[in-house]
């Protein structure tokens, strides 16, 4: 059996999967935010409860909103303050007396999609989460690419390309990012960026769902804005498609539910690519909120 944990700032979700990726048991608990020992105990108790439910000792994979850094496995994860700077993998492996694997939750999302029955044949899968920020990951031949520092999928912290300024104006504010830099693309093409850009251009703060409703209703400002946003999205994604040349691009997060993306984006991307480049298949994520635990379980299952 394969155990996948999706650890968030407010909840920890555990999904138990068999070798065919069928979910056989699940449980959700609140995330201890202050005390590391309490967090460890919560995870250990969940694993032992799952063992009792399925009658075997499962293999443990964990997706976290952050990265594992350095040689001692210390975590860099602002959303899990109890685990910040702690060697969670080492400590949990010691307590459980079994191998524990940890990866970024966005990598787990992409891994889950890459192992979907419909998508499994694609050698290179690029995934983007257009949510509050812009997360993502790259899976090649069924395995996530982590990089030297574990930040290979932090696409949101690439800077705005020069042709983006032709679309949204050279005087666009270089928004200060949480990473400490300015002009990171997640502040412009994420769900939050979608709303910020609209307010910047039209002086009116509206939620994304309202802007999209106005767009579908034919409202002129919303139509103009979405047209420019799609050009901006294509300009930013064009660099990623040229860099990684994926067979499949999977989109997740709240903005991925704007279904018009899948009709408009393929018409805007070709001019951003090399003339010989063929577009990848572009799809909405198949597994939604369940992708986190599924991908975490795959951190072990992918070796089979």
Curated annotation (Swiss-Prot):
TM spans (from-to): none
Reactions catalysed according to its record: N-acetyl-D-glucosamine + ATP = N-acetyl-D-glucosamine 6-phosphate + ADP + H(+)
Keyword check for Transferase: yes
Sample GO molecular function, one term: ATP binding
Gene3D superfamilies assigned to the protein according to its UniProt record, in alphabetical order: 3.30.420.40
Keywords: ATP-binding, Carbohydrate metabolism, Kinase, Metal-binding, Nucleotide-binding, Transferase, Zinc
The UniProt record lists the keyword Iron-sulfur: no
Alphabetical list of InterPro entries matching this protein: ATPase_NBD (IPR043129), N-acetyl-D-glucosamine_kinase (IPR023505), ROK (IPR000600), ROK_cs (IPR049874)
Functional pathway: Cell wall biogenesis; peptidoglycan recycling
Residues annotated for Zn(2+) binding in this entry: 157, 177, 179, 184
Superkingdom per UniProt: Bacteria
Binding site for ATP: 4-11, 133-140
The EC number(s) this enzyme carries: 2.7.1.59
Pfam families: ROK
GO biological process: N-acetylglucosamine metabolic process; peptidoglycan turnover
HAMAP family cross-referenced by the UniProt entry: GlcNAc_kinase
Family according to the record: Belongs to the ROK (NagC/XylR) family. NagK subfamily.
Job description of the protein: Catalyzes the phosphorylation of N-acetyl-D-glucosamine (GlcNAc) derived from cell-wall degradation, yielding GlcNAc-6-P.
Record-given protein name: N-acetyl-D-glucosamine kinase
Native species: Pectobacterium carotovorum subsp. carotovorum (strain PC1)
């Amino acid at each position: 059996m394969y155990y996948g944990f999706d650890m968030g700032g407010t909840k920890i979700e555990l999904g138990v999967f068999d070798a065919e990726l069928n979910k056989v048991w699940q449980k959700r608990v609140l995330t201890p935010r202050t005390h590391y020992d309490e967090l460890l105990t919560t995870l250990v108790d969940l694993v032992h409860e799952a063992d009792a439910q399925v009658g075997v000792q499962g293999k443990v994979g964990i997706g976290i909103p952050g990265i594992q850094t350095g040689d001692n496995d210390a975590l860099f994860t602002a959303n899990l303050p109890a685990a910040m700077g702690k060697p969670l993998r080492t400590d949990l492996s010691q307590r459980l007396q079994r191998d524990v694997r940890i990866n970024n939750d966005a990598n787990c999302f992409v891994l889950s999609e890459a192992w979907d029955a419909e998508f499994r044949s694609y050698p290179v899968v690029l995934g983007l989460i257009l949510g509050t920020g812009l997360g993502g990951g790259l899976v090649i031949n069924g395995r996530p690419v982590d990089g030297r520092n574990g930040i290979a999928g932090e696409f949101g912290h690439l800077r705005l390309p020069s042709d983006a300024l032709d679309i949204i104006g050279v005087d666009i504010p270089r928004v200060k990012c949480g990473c400490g830099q300015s002009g990171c693309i997640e502040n412009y093409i994420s769900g939050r960026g979608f709303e910020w850009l609209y307010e910047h251009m039209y002086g009116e703060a509206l939620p994304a769902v309202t802007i999209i409703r106005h767009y579908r209703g034919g409202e002129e400002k919303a139509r103009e804005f979405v047209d420019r946003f799609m050009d901006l999205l294509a300009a930013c994604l064009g660099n990623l498609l040229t860099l990684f040349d994926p067979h499949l691009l999977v989109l997740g997060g709240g903005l991925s539910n704007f279904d018009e993306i899948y009709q408009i984006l393929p018409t805007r991307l070709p001019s951003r690519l090399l003339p010989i480049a063929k577009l990848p298949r572009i799809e909405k994520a198949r597994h939604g909120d369940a992708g986190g635990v599924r991908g975490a379980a795959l951190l072990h299952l992918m070796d089979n």
